[in-house]
Amino acid sequence: MSLNLDKITPELIEKTIREKNIKFIRYLYIDLDNVIRGRVSTAKNIDTDLRGGLTLAMIMQSGFSITDLAVSGTIYGPRGEVTLIPDISTFKVLPYVDATAAMIVEQYVGDKPHEVDPRPKLRGYLKNLGYEFKIGIEPEFYILKKSPRGVIEPYERHLCFSTEGMNA
């Protein structure tokens, strides 16, 4: 079954989950360093997740560095949580992971978009220019092979965007 993204509804998502035997949903967001991050929830929680979102500690936006500790008086101090609100138009059954689907989420603090979430900012910029916001995540992928010993390894050992790869 192919989803019509112009007509996707929570009911259609729930039906797809049942028909495709989806067990897990990945809720994905892009951080300020353009790294895909996310949370995983069981598919049985889809109704609750779509109605109320999921929570994430605000400190998770700090960069995951030991030097980025929760310090009072900063945006990442003990302020609570952001709410991840799923964008149902981005629902996709993942063909490369068994029984798993994914959706992009937007981050909210209370009822306002979180100031470090790039999606609402881009949507606003595009609206000011007269454009419509339609964007997804660029997935990274790897080509692998099985070695003679049966070990899965990279097909190519050269680094991407490195001059070393140009000498192959």
Regions found by a protein language model. Give the residues of each.
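Glycine-rich, acidic/polar active-site loops that bind/position phosphate-bearing ligands
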Residues: S2-A168
